């Protein structure tokens, strides 16, 4: 461990070595606290765990003995009086001071004192050096991207024949270094960003058109499937056709983007309608009278605003189930209910056989001992009943 902290830097402020020091002008602190270990060298650190002032050699010898001793907290000795542990560090003077010396030194100066804990001086120094080196490396790397010193030096070496050539080369090198190179860099950045934006916009448009085409194809396939099922199982009147007609009529009024958003909203809405209808039809004995479409103020929000999809008179009609359809559905439900089979299956045959063989008392299962007790009671009661007639003992 290296504890070379240098000499005292507060001789003039505290009065050491001159007027109030009591020692020579060129000498250090003659009253520095000696090391508690060797009693020969001045102490440089203070160990709080051992409550001892140690020099650099004694500190290395004592605290390097084992791991427990190496974990002891140690602080520097005050650089002004060299007789007390340092409590804080002054950034302006780059020195560690105890409380008394801090008050004595900074009370004479009207400037505000900037102090930090003494234990964090070393950590802050390491962090500061790392950040400074990192900033310098990044700055050097950034300027290396724009450097053309090798090209400029080659031009200057090849064109040193006369003064005119030197002037021309110097002008061209200056232009290339300070103007042409920077302008070229910024122009390229602007052009590249503009070109990249144009390419991204074109790709987004092509991707959007492709998505619109896929959505239209999916919607057409869904319409075909619903049209095929409409004659056999669909109970609600055809809503897909009405919605598609209104979509085609709306395409001529609004733009392509609004039309695409409207088709997406309609497809989502039709999916919800089909789900609600299929769920209601599966319920036993419950036939809904109307669907969500009966609400007159149902709207679909699009980026262009709220568009009323059911403002036309054809869609405002109440979608009630006809009586024939209701009767057919009820009859079909009853037929399915009659066709249900409820068969009793014996899960454990051995248990059934054992239950049939077990003894019972008044219909309930009984243990073997209980049966024997009951039989004994029956015989005892029979004997008592026989004794009521009277028996003559024979000797």
From Swiss-Prot:
Inducing factors: Expressed with a circadian rhythm showing a peak at night and then decreasing to reach the lowest levels around the middle of the day in LD conditions. The levels of expression in SD conditions are slightly lower.
Keywords in alphabetical order: Developmental protein, Differentiation, DNA-binding, Flowering, Metal-binding, Nucleus, Phosphoprotein, Repeat, Transcription, Transcription regulation, Zinc, Zinc-finger
Extent of Low complexity compositional bias: 152-175
Post-translational modification: Phosphorylated by OSK4 in the presence of HDR1.
Zinc finger (B box-type): 30-72, 73-117
InterPro entries: CCT_domain, CONSTANS-like, CONSTANS-like_Bbox1, Znf_B-box
CDD domains linked to this entry: Bbox1_BBX-like
Transcription regulation as UniProt keyword: yes
GO aspect biological process, one term: long-day photoperiodism
Residue positions binding Zn(2+) 2: 78, 81, 101, 106
Protein origin, superkingdom: Eukaryota
Pfam families: CCT, zf-B_box
Domain CCT: 326-368
PROSITE patterns per the UniProt record, alphabetical: CCT, ZF_BBOX
Other facts: The GIGANTEA-CONSTANS-FLOWER LOCUS T (GI-CO-FT) pathway to control photoperiodic flowering under LD is conserved between Arabidopsis and rice, but the regulation of the downstream gene by the upstream regulatory gene is reversed in the two species. In Arabidopsis, GI acts as an activator of CO, which in turn activates the floral activator FT under LD conditions. In rice, GI activates HD1/CO in a similar manner to that in Arabidopsis. However, under LD conditions, HD1 suppresses HD3A/FT expression, causing the suppression of flowering.
Subunit organization: Interacts with HAL3 in the dark.
Protein name: Zinc finger protein HD1
